[in-house]
């Protein structure tokens, strides 16, 4: 390297990545001869790991199974597009327990959708914030225990909601089941209508944990607001209630199944 180091000037523009941009030790130089990566401060260089899809490419939803699961208020608004036909990769089956923290090597790269630079959210309940469960019925086993039991708890929303959840194809809860500093998602194995109880497919619930916050997501039964979406993972059909307004004519879908940038 030159004695005064090297500067890599990134030209302005958008750089669409199909894999993680990785920098390792040899890419940094030394403290005396550093390698500096930068763009012109008066211009912008974007690193992009997404696919852009025009809202006009979404078609009316015609799948009778999905339509029957949507709230009536959403049925005339929801439009869809086939990700498989577009060649966009996605996780076809969610595990029984997972998280999406990028700091973890085993983090699940979930599909993310953005509109006008802001994230849109999977159909969920409640639409904002968290609900809370009541009594812990079964502690369950730690997620690392192979073939471990899932925890169970009572939950008393309105009876019709719990009845809809009992018939859901794929019910996922995200919550702080063990600690207030750690949340994760867990598949529901069983909804007991008689006891108003939910049993997780996997995962430990701490009986002494007082917060007990969670929300349900990945549910077409709860798609009831503009900007919410649902992905039918078996056939790749992305269902979206388009956002209100005219801030953008397209949405962007995350493409990578790993970090956008990794520095080792």
What is the meaning of each model-derived region?
Residues 1-264:
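Extracellular polysaccharide-degrading/modifying enzymes targeting complex plant/algal/animal polysaccharides
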């Amino acid at each position: 390297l030159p004695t005064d180091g090297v500067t890599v000037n990134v030209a302005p523009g958008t750089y669409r990545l199909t894999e993680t941009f990785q920098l390792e030790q040899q890419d940094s130089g030394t403290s005396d001869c550093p390698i500096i990566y930068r763009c012109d401060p008066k211009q912008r260089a974007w690193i992009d790991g997404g696919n852009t899809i025009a809202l006009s490419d979404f078609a009316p939803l015609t799948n009778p199974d999905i339509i029957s699961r949507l709230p009536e208020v959403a049925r005339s608004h929801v439009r869809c597009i086939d990700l498989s036909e577009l060649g966009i990769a996605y996780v076809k089956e969610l595990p029984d327990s997972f998280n999406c923290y990028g700091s973890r090597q085993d983090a699940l790269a979930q599909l993310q959708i953005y509109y006008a630079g802001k994230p849109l959210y999977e159909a969920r309940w409640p639409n904002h914030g968290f609900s809370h469960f009541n009594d812990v019925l079964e502690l369950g086993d730690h997620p690392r225990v192979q073939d471990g039991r899932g925890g169970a708890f009572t939950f008393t929303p309105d009876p019709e909601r719990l009845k809809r959840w009992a018939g859901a194809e794929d019910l996922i809860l995200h919550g702080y089941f063990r600690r207030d500093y750690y949340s994760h998602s867990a598949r529901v194995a069983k909804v007991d209508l008689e006891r108003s109880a939910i049993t997780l497919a996997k995962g430990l619930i701490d009986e002494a944990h007082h917060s007990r916050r969670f929300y349900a997501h990945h549910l077409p039964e709860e798609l009831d607001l503009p900007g919410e979406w649902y992905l039918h993972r078996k056939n790749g059909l992305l269902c979206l209630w388009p956002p209100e307004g005219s801030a953008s004519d397209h949405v962007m879908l995350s493409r990578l199944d790993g970090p956008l940038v990794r520095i080792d």
